[in-house]
Amino acid sequence: MRNDKIAIGVDIGGTNIRAGAVSNDGGLIGESFSVSTNATERKELILSRIVDSISRIITQNKLSISDIQGIGLGCTGPLDVKKGLILECPNLPTMDYFPLRSEIEKAFNLPVFMNNDANAMMLGEASWGAGRGASSVLGITLGTGFGCAIILNQKIWMGATETAGEIWISPYGDGYIEEVVSAAGVCKLYEKLSGLKASSKQIAHLANEGDQFAKAVWEEFGKAVAFALSWSINLLDPEIVIIGGSISNAFELFYPSLYESLVKTICPVPAQNLKIVKAQLGDNAGFIGAAALVF
């Protein structure tokens, strides 16, 4: 039996399932594992992949059940966290109202902790990443969608109905802010300006190469993120703002317009101390954050 405390974290998205063993100081133990979710298949098959991912982490890293303190699940939502249910989830369309937590508990006879992927990821960043040591963290994830998490004293603030941080639905222009502050929004604006189709990753590359249309896209993107954050910063006065998700790889491209816009729209005192940083845990952030739910 090992002396250190270990949790298994699982990041469950519409595209991939990623799992890893994590120590209570945030260190990755051994190798992680990833498999395609195949989200349109039957729920039993998706559950089987989740269970198999956890089993592989245990066997390939030569762990025993007695070594493991618990299992953390960071899952695309919406969720009923108290009941451990996936609700009507567009990214997992065959798993509506599926009791995921209890199924994993039955499979391994271990405590299982579950939260949405944005909350889990930012708990990991607050515990072991860019927000380590901060008492209040506001985190956003930018990628396929727009997620937000509030971490106070190393605990996720869920709100009365478990929907704290759902700012993606904030009105913006003729629609919602997520329609702009997402990979699809980046691609749509670039096509509108240039007449060309490209992925968000390609648009970041083009901007770095000097493409004026691509640079304009990231400038507008930063302004939109600032709009979304300004209300939250004025309300919460967080010690640090962390930006993660796949689009955070373009952080240097949109940060200047984000910062410039924010300092004009938030209260003067927090504006003087504003700290906005890129997430640090990288591709492992999802399952490391899920493991943080256990400790």
Task: Annotate each PLM feature.
Residues 1-70, 79-85, 102-110, 127-134, ...:
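ATP-binding/phosphotransfer module of carbohydrate and carboxylate kinases, centering on a glycine-rich
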Residues 11, 72-76, 115, 139-145, ...:
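Short beta-strand segments
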Residues 32-33, 90, 160:
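Short hydrophobic alpha-helix segments
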Residues 36-38, 94-95, 163-166:
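A short acidic/small-residue loop/turn micro-motif
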Residues 84-94:
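A charged helix-plus-loop insertion that forms the helical arch/lid used to bind
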Residues 91-93, 113-119, 139-142, 277-283:
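Active-site nucleophile and cofactor-binding loops and adjacent substrate-binding regions
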Residues 115-129:
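Conserved PLP phosphate-binding loop immediately N-terminal to the Schiff-base lysine helix
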Residues 130-184:
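Glycine-rich phosphate-binding loop of actin/hexokinase-like ATP-binding domains
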